[in-house]
Design a protein with these regions (language model features):
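Short loop/turn motifs at secondary-structure junctions and domain boundaries
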Residues: 22, 60-63, 94-100, 165-168, ...
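PAS-family sensory modules
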Residues: 1-27, 124-132, 229-238, 242
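Regulatory sensory and allosteric helical modules in signal-transduction proteins
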Residues: 36-87, 142-150, 154-192, 249-252, ...
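A short, aliphatic-rich beta-strand micro-motif
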Residues: 101-109, 208-215, 312-319
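Short hydrophobic alpha-helical segments used for membrane anchoring or interfacial signaling
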Residues: 28-37, 133-141, 146-148, 239-247
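Short beta-strand-to-loop transition segments that serve as allosteric relay/switch motifs
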Residues: 117-125, 223-231, 326-332
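Short hydrophobic/aromatic beta-strand element in the GNAT-like acyltransferase core
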Residues: 27, 92, 105, 117, ...
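Flexible loop/coil segments at beta-strand boundaries within sensory signal-transduction domains
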Residues: 109-114, 125-126, 141, 215-220, ...
Length: 332
């Protein structure tokens, strides 16, 4: 059994709860290969109040290079669509009807085997600040990472500057996850040496970031960055878990939470077994997972999240041909 968490979280004010309901990401979906491996089918998703869009999505199937999930499968790296069109997003009309306008799809591979595709969908909103970015390096043509595409809400100037930014290996959030081959959380961007665009970001309210690497068999590397703002957060908590030295449990590596600044102390002695809670399930299956309600997750991570007033989560494995390298979780 994992030890009891040492610290409880403070009371969450009603004003904060109201503010945090305006999330940057509106929908998260998981698509997995069918038994014959020819298509992608729906596994699970977080839709909030968009139950009608879920009903449209559940019966759908996507072939190789078909729709947003299928294009990420074919490409082998994250794909971002800033504007949905019927030619590239088969649910464009249904998405438009509920205010969804853009999205990103991130494939999960174990070696060359596709495990799943995680899709995040966003919508236009006059108040939305934040960013979801895809960066890329091709070593045959450059020593730097450049922006492939991104969604920035209303942060138009931040987007413009990003298009003219380049990151050498080991510099900035994209460059650091590229060099390490591991996910990374940057908290308190204003005082972080890891985030080179801190001044531009903090001026518009972006205060934390998550970077996830996507190495490719070609030797090219992509990086997905999620940049979260105070008022329209991508997530209220980010966590990274990694296998222990003995590979018999997952241990806490890094995290950042609005409502608990003592995550490292809380999790210092915590070990999550394979299959334990949502995080342990992701380790056991190699598949991303979503939870609409964390009340039933009795793992240390689940209990900590509930104590902080968090209700739902997305968890994604970062894998190679040998298995799990790290696990990234974000909570709402």
């Amino acid at each position: 059994m994992s030890p009891t968490l040492a610290h409880s979280s403070p009371m969450i004010s009603p004003a904060l709860v109201a503010r945090m309901t305006r999330t940057f990401v509106r929908v998260a979906e998981i698509w997995v290969p069918t038994k014959d491996g020819t298509k992608l089918q729906f596994l699970d998703g977080l839709y909030g109040s968009l139950s009608g869009f879920r009903a449209v999505s559940e019966p759908m199937r996507f072939g190789f290079d078909e729709g947003l999930p299928g294009k990420a499968w074919a490409a082998g790296h994250p794909i971002i669509l800033k504007r949905f069109e019927s030619s590239s997003f088969e649910r464009a009309e249904a998405a438009k009807a509920v205010g969804l306008t853009c999205g990103v799809a991130a494939p999960v591979f174990a070696g060359d085997r596709l495990m799943a595709v995680l899709v995040l969908l966003c919508g236009d909103d006059d108040a939305h600040i934040g960013a979801i970015e895809v960066w890329h390096n091709d070593p045959a043509t450059s020593y730097e990472m450049r922006l492939v595409g991104g969604y920035y809400g209303t942060a138009a100037m931040f987007e413009l500057n990003a298009r003219y930014t380049r990151f050498p290996r080991g510099y900035g959030l994209p460059g650091r996850v590229w060099k390490s081959g591991m996910p990374m959380i940057v908290k308190d961007l204003k005082h972080s040496k890891a985030f080179l665009r801190w001044q531009e970001a903090t001026e518009i309210g972006i205060n934390r970031g998550l970077g996830i690497p996507f190495p490719h068999a070609s030797g090219q590397t992509w990086a997905l960055t999620l940049l979260s703002a105070h008022d329209t957060p991508i997530a209220r908590r980010f966590e990274i878990w990694v296998p222990s030295a003995e590979h018999d449990a997952l241990i806490f590596n890094a995290g950042d939470c609005d409502q608990n600044t003592q995550l490292a102390a809380d999790y210092a002695a915590v070990k999550i077994a394979k299959g334990e809670g949502t995080i342990g399930q992701v380790w056991a299956t190699g598949l991303p997972a979503v939870r609409d309600s964390l009340a039933a997750d009795t793992s240390p991570a689940g209990r900590s999240a509930v104590a902080a007033g968090l209700e739902s989560m997305v968890a994604m494995p970062v894998m190679n041909e040998h298995g799990l390298k790290a696990l990234v979780a974000w909570y709402f």
